[in-house]
Amino acid sequence: MKSVNTIHEVKNIVKDWKKQGLSVGLVPTMGYLHEGHGSLILKARENSKVVVSIFVNPMQFGPTEDLEKYPRDLEKDLKYCEELGADLIFSPEPGEMYPEGFCTSVDMSVLTEELCGLSRPSHFKGVCTIVNKLLNIVNPDRAYFGEKDAQQLVIVKRMVRDLNMDIEIVGCPIIREKDGLAKSSRNTYLNSEERRAALVLSKSIFTGKDMVKKGCRETDVLLKKMKAIIDQEPLARIDYLKAVDTMTMQQVDTIDRPVLIAMAVYIGNVRLIDNFSFIPD
């Protein structure tokens, strides 16, 4: 495994792989890797070579968000990537990705108006810009994203389609702790009491999933029950809890098409997300 931090080095290495006819998979991350990221890296090994990018992207953090506090441990991440069989790690400094005079961004108006885009207005502009740059730098055959960030996955797929990029975007299932909590780098912010309280997210998700499987199709009934579970926890504060069309990200009243049920919930000061999708017969 090789680790580099300049765009020039990545391009040269990948160019050499491509000359040999090798396929390349990219796993974009912000580091502080856990088993969720690990599942993406393992899936990406269906390619000849695996590139993992580690970059805490300042452009996707709002002015009051946790950029400086976001957990980082590059040495541990490198060891983990090597254990999982990654071939190349790209961990640039902010100045490498956004040099002086950088003034271009990629924005998407339609799919960013709901869910995380509503409470984090500039977030997806930052996501689209950095993902676009990484796809251009690495030029992978496939790129891998977790379904926990479901809205991000939909947006990246649309961006790749709209900009005629010949890259397959692969979504990978949510990986959970043994007690059900979706794995997230931000889980490390939780103290023991908050960690216990955070289980209301997965409890609500599992209840909602069960209701839909048993035939519930009215989203107001579904969301009311899911909200009641979260409201029982004093440390929990709902940012959003919505049912949206998986293609348009617009809210729906009836589950008569593929639907995403998504939530963002503050546990104390820590914002966590979770979701499930359902495709009716």
Swiss-Prot record:
A cellular-component GO term for this protein: cytosol
Binding residues for beta-alanine: 60
Single GO term (MF): pantoate-beta-alanine ligase activity
Residues holding (R)-pantoate: 60, 152
Catalyses which reaction(s): (R)-pantoate + beta-alanine + ATP = (R)-pantothenate + AMP + diphosphate + H(+)
Pathway assigned to this chain's UniProt record: Cofactor biosynthesis; (R)-pantothenate biosynthesis; (R)-pantothenate from (R)-pantoate and beta-alanine: step 1/1
Enzyme Commission no: 6.3.2.1
Keywords: ATP-binding, Cytoplasm, Ligase, Nucleotide-binding, Pantothenate biosynthesis
Broad class of enzyme this protein falls into: ligase
Active site, UniProt feature: 37 (proton donor)
Localization (cell): Cytoplasm
Binding site for ATP: 30-37, 146-149, 175, 183-186
Disulfide bonds: none
Gene Ontology biological-process entries: pantothenate biosynthetic process
InterPro entries on file: Pantoate_ligase (IPR003721), Pantoate_ligase_C (IPR042176), Rossmann-like_a/b/a_fold (IPR014729)
PANTHER family: CYTIDYLATE KINASE/PANTOATE-BETA-ALANINE LIGASE (PTHR21299), PANTOATE--BETA-ALANINE LIGASE (PTHR21299:SF1)
Role: Catalyzes the condensation of pantoate with beta-alanine in an ATP-dependent reaction via a pantoyl-adenylate intermediate.
Family: Belongs to the pantothenate synthetase family.
Note: The reaction proceeds by a bi uni uni bi ping pong mechanism.
Complex formation: Homodimer.
Protein's UniProt name: Pantothenate synthetase
Taxonomic placement: Bacteria, Bacillati, Bacillota, Clostridia, Eubacteriales
